[in-house]
Curated annotation (Swiss-Prot):
<dbReference type="InterPro" id="IPR000055">
    <property type="entry name" value="Restrct_endonuc_typeI_TRD"/>
</dbReference>
<comment type="function">
    <text>The specificity (S) subunit of a type I restriction enzyme; this subunit dictates DNA sequence specificity. In the presence of the R subunit the complex can also act as an endonuclease, binding to the same target sequence but cutting the DNA some distance from this site. Whether the DNA is cut or modified depends on the methylation state of the target sequence. When the target site is unmodified, the DNA is cut.</text>
</comment>
<keyword id="KW-0238">DNA-binding</keyword>
<comment type="subunit">
    <text>The type I restriction/modification system is composed of three polypeptides R, M and S. The restriction enzyme has stoichiometry R(2)M(2)S(1) while the methyltransferase is M(2)S(1).</text>
</comment>
<dbReference type="Pfam" id="PF01420">
    <property type="entry name" value="Methylase_S"/>
</dbReference>
<keyword id="KW-0680">Restriction system</keyword>
<dbReference type="GO" id="GO:0009307">
    <property type="term" value="P:DNA restriction-modification system"/>
</dbReference>
<protein>
    <recommendedName>
        <fullName>Type I restriction enzyme EcoAI specificity subunit</fullName>
    </recommendedName>
</protein>
<dbReference type="GO" id="GO:0003677">
    <property type="term" value="F:DNA binding"/>
</dbReference>
<comment type="similarity">
    <text>Belongs to the type-I restriction system S methylase family.</text>
</comment>
<dbReference type="InterPro" id="IPR044946">
    <property type="entry name" value="Restrct_endonuc_typeI_TRD_sf"/>
</dbReference>
<dbReference type="InterPro" id="IPR051212">
    <property type="entry name" value="Type-I_RE_S_subunit"/>
</dbReference>
Amino acid sequence: MSVEKLIVDHMETWTSALQTRSTAGRGSSGKIDLYGIKKLRELILELAVRGKLVPQDPNDEPASELLKRIAAEKAELVKQGKIKKQKPLPEISEEEKPFELPDGWEWTTLTRIAEINPKIDVSDDEQEISFIPMPLISTKFDGSHEFEIKKWKDVKKGYTHFANGDIAIAKITPCFENSKAAIFSGLKNGIGVGTTELHVARPFSDIINRKYLLLNFKSPNFLKSGESQMTGSAGQKRVPRFFFENNPIPFPPLQEQERIIIRFTQLMSLCDQLEQQSLTSLDAHQQLVETLLGTLTDSQNVEELAENWARISEHFDTLFTTEASVDALKQTILQLAVMGKLVPQDPNDEPASELLKRIAQEKAQLVKEGKIKKQKPLPPISDEEKPFELPEGWEWCRLGSIYNFLNGYAFKSEWFTSVGLRLLRNANIAHGVTNWKDVVHIPNDMISDFENYILSENDIVISLDRPIINTGLKYAIISKSDLPCLLLQRVAKFKNYANTVSNSFLTIWLQSYFFINSIDPGRSNGVPHISTKQLEMTLFPLLPQSEQDRIISKMDELIQTCNKLKYIIKTAKQTQLHLADALTDAAIN
């Protein structure tokens, strides 16, 4: 099967095999790895160095003759004293050859055709040369790089030397695995100096095609072999020089090398086009989803909401086909819930204004009993502060009027022990749950000194640390398995007056964009922590308790549906990834 047919016949697999990145990027497509196109690039590269990308021509001068000419030029360099004479090199054994070569090709090694890590001597210390740190070396297939200008005297020691025409690969992890490699060109005065984390090769002859050698250094087989040979500790592993200079290289006739480079460049350009089309399509799809979902939250009444939802539901199967689109749907459901648009209001429900009266009565009683201090009146809420209009029976209030916030205690680190009472820190709070992987304790007998900081089942705690990332605020509901534990500083506990708000509805509000934007509008400014005063001042849409229950029931039902849909999408995506892998393996083997 030709490469063109392989691409065209399986276009859907190459373009639909997507992988979600762990780190966020710009737009929805910035969080997506185009796995299928990545595998297609790797396949084209591997076919190139195995002699399967272009047909062989029996009229080409065989690689054996090319290697003889290179050996002759190498001998001349030795004769001129430009390089040292090498010891006789052992033949490449059959066991070392990873695959079978086409007719006219030969196995060779870098040490047979290039000088490894050559030195450069410059007589003028003031001479300007190119300086190339690792970040300026590209992972692209063209071997491109950038450089800074420095004087020779400033960089002649402690760095790697190279010149125009030299080829280099990164030897340290993860730069090696990411295929950072370069063909040096355009260097100031033809000379360069750079990071010590490079292996450099200077071909003995100008007839050697540098671009073809670069393809070898970027091929999946070379990278996989190099990774297996790395030495050193985790995070500091390096590909040894021995591997670089002795790993077998599949070497084609010179004319075929040139045809391979031309064809490879054409196919990479095609991959670039596919990649751009895929990214544009993904972004357009997500923008469409978010625009249509926006009509739901912007709906002025129940009738308009029903009309807008009908428009979306007609195209549900084509709209919600990615994990990002389902996440957007979940966030919209959450927004509708806190805006009072998810379930109809019941005029028979006790209005929120009555709940506020009960809260005021309970607070007055607690003050009378000396259990809490009398609170200064919180400022009235202006119309400008209100992010949206509330339904009948709801009331805007400040969180500080319905919750008392307790900040954690600043336990001293010298009190910490390996066993005892657990301390709940920021590190132990994830998004909705606790995480006890990294735990600190204080002695059990100290509990009586800190009774106010003892947490109970169903307490809600919130991290006061910035940054608040796009996935939402860090909060947790304390469960029985978390106990006993004490509250550490920079974590706050919500204490609800008169049990007027269910924990479930509060957590829905904490996840909403309205709350996140009110507590951290610039997505994390220079202030490292959120204060409990800020929490007290933020707004909360207080609603009838019966409606809270109806909303939570509906939310559970809809989120469960979203989770099922996301699972189906993930499963289908995994199948596409396996299919891309299988196609690649089948084409190579």
